[in-house]
A protein has these predicted regions:
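Disordered, acidic Ser/Thr/Pro-rich linker "stalks" and the adjacent N-terminal cap
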Residues: 17-87, 103-105, 175-205
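Extended, low-complexity, turn-rich repeat/linker tracts enriched in Gly/Pro/Ser/Thr and Asp/Glu
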Residues: 9, 100-108
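Beta-sandwich interaction modules
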Residues: 1-9, 79, 86-90, 128-166
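Short beta-strand elements bearing conserved aromatic residues within extracellular beta-rich modules
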Residues: 110-112
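Intrinsic, low-complexity N-terminal interaction/targeting segments
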Residues: 55-74, 121-147
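Hydrophobic, ordered structural segments
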Residues: 1-32, 151-178
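Short loop/turn segments immediately following beta-strands, especially the blade-tip
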Residues: 21, 116-121
Length: 205
């Protein structure tokens, strides 16, 4: 992407909207399946009063509460949640839940669930598999949990009880063989011919 201005002058912001096409050479092995830079995205949420849950999958660590997901206090029943599409189908291995900067407004508990939308309906609550049961978390803390998951996941649901903010959420795992093959093809097809010539050894076979 190249921006040209004539003859000069300033630009406050430039937004280019689309879907991330990650370089598959960085997706081989254990990666953050949820990261926006790898193609993860927010697809549903209950509340984004102060800040969107899309923030918690952005690169790097948050520098303040405004760079995480900050929801409003709930006055009724229920709990807040966010649903994400993973970069591709993969097997989750461990998760990091970061409540840094959230001191008086961190969740009391969190829960994680996953689903493989290739063979199940994400609108069917009974089709989701629990990755992390409802677990107490501390304010202003980075929590890490090892997951025991047999199958692949494509979507992740985060539930916070009853509400509360997070700085970041990382879901580390391995893409399945077909997902990695599809990622290679998508990336290759998105390259201009002049770029393909520079990485000819990466052409899908």
């Amino acid at each position: 992407m190249r921006l040209s201005i004539y003859p000069d002058g300033g630009v406050a912001r430039l937004r280019v909207h689309g879907e991330v096409v990650p370089d598959p050479r960085f997706l081989d092995g254990t990666v953050d399946l949820l990261a926006a830079e790898n193609g993860g995205r927010l697809v549903g949420w209950s509340d984004a009063f102060y800040a969107s849950p899309a923030n918690i999958i952005l690169p790097g660590r948050a520098r303040n509460m405004g760079e995480g997901w900050e929801n409003a206090r709930r006055r009724g029943g229920g709990n807040d949640f966010a649903v994400f599409a993973l970069a591709a189908a993969g097997r989750p291995r461990h998760v990091e839940i970061d409540t840094s900067y959230y001191v008086g407004n961190a969740p009391g508990w969190v829960r994680l669930s996953a689903i493989d939308a290739r063979s199940a309906d994400i609108d069917d609550d009974s089709a989701w598999t629990e990755l992390l049961p409802r677990t107490a978390v501390q304010p202003d803390t980075r929590h890490r949990f090892v997951l025991d998951v047999a199958g692949a996941a494509i979507h992740l649901r985060l539930d916070v009880y009853p509400d509360g903010g997070l700085s970041r959420l990382r879901l580390f795992g391995d893409l399945d063989e077909q997902a990695l093959s599809d990622a290679r093809r998508t990336w290759w097809d998105a390259l201009p011919p002049s770029h393909q010539a520079l990485v000819a050894d990466q052409a899908p076979r």
